[in-house]
Amino acid sequence: MTITGIIAEFNPFHNGHKYLLDQAEGLKIVAMSGNFMQRGEPAIVDKWTRAQMALENGADLVVELPFLVSVQAADFFGQGAVDILDRLGIDSLVFGTEEVLDYQKIADLYTEKGAEMEKFVKNLPDSLSYPQKTQAMWKEFAGLDFSGNTPNHVLALAYAKAVAGRNIKLHPIQRQGAGYHSVNKDVDFASATALRQHQKDQDFLERFMPSVALFEQASKVIWEDYFPLLRYQILSNPDLTTIYQVNQEMAVRIKEAIKTAQSVEELVELVTTKRYTKARVRRLLTYILMQARESDLPEAIHVLGFTEKGRQHLKSLKGQVSLVSRIGKEPWDAMTQKADQIYQLGKPSIAEQNFGRVPIRIETN
């Protein structure tokens, strides 16, 4: 049987995600971000709610990406997620993308020329942002052009790099309907961005979300809910360079900007430069919010939920892979658990995220 991996945020889960799961074959394993997203923002609803949405709509097993995999630039996000899925025995990776492209060929190219390609990136001027460097590399070696806003395509290339040299086949699914950042309401499939923006529009949600009741019952948060705490973390820390990935230049810019910024968005605008993209700045602010330090990734994989089919697969992995299904006195990953505690500060109604929580079980699919 095919074992298909899917790397996702489901922020929130919508019909486009359901379409992706419907297109996937065999046993479907989702490696999902926890409570903070790849582009450096809190999830609109918590990880347990999003895992349940996925399990109700075709996923067989949902595992959590640790915080320091979840909140990373595309390449590190892709690498960390593929590492986890590889250990869970996937033989194919399904993903949505805006481009029609032979990603397998790109993975093969990277297998062959990876060292040369990385050397090319290293030699590019530092005035370029990391995404610009990566795009220059793909243009040079694979002849790829980057048109407009295609974040899923950028992630797909990161997945192609991550599966290089592994026995995992890539299966791109053409993205349906609205683009990633689109807020258009007149489409067959709405984007997660549009759903976040129109979260109070009942008809809109019902049209584009399969598990709408779960979404409506859940506590919702936005970045601004954490701004007072972020402000405190910046002002009270005498040396921001002790925080993960924050360099001297960024530390100075952030300290200066916080004097006048009245919101997270304003802070991001003030700190962003040509070299430091908005997504990168948001990630740095997320690290500051957590007081994140460089730390090792957990050995074990945290299971958020499964169907009967998923449970059988976990059983078959016993003894080969270290799995955590209940977090007790011993932490699974201290950094992720700290992030969860801070996430809960966004709204008093958010449920406990770790202690006493056990995987969600869905009997039928």
From Swiss-Prot:
SUPFAM superfamilies linked to this entry = Nucleotidylyl transferase
Q: What is its EC number?
A: 6.3.4.-
Q: Which GO terms describe its biological process?
A: tRNA modification
Annotated InterPro entries: Rossmann-like_a/b/a_fold, tRNA(Met)_cyd_acetate_ligase
UniProt GO molecular function: ATP binding; ligase activity, forming carbon-nitrogen bonds; tRNA binding
Q: What class of enzyme is it?
A: ligase
- Alphabetical list of Pfam families matching this protein: HIGH_NTase1 (PF05636)
What protein family does this chain belong to? Belongs to the TmcAL family.
The UniProt keyword set, sorted, is: ATP-binding, Cytoplasm, Ligase, Nucleotide-binding, RNA-binding, tRNA processing, tRNA-binding
N-terminal signal peptide? none
User: What subcellular compartments does it reside in?
Assistant: Cytoplasm
Can you state which reaction this protein catalyses?
cytidine(34) in elongator tRNA(Met) + acetate + ATP = N(4)-acetylcytidine(34) in elongator tRNA(Met) + AMP + diphosphate
| NCBIfam families in UniProt | PRK13670.1
Where, in this chain's numbering, is ATP bound? 7-20, 96, 152, 175
* Entry protein name: tRNA(Met) cytidine acetate ligase
Per the UniProt record, the source organism is Streptococcus pneumoniae (strain CGSP14)
What is this protein's function? Catalyzes the formation of N(4)-acetylcytidine (ac(4)C) at the wobble position of elongator tRNA(Met), using acetate and ATP as substrates. First activates an acetate ion to form acetyladenylate (Ac-AMP) and then transfers the acetyl group to tRNA to form ac(4)C34.
Top-level taxon: Bacteria
| One term under GO cellular component | cytoplasm
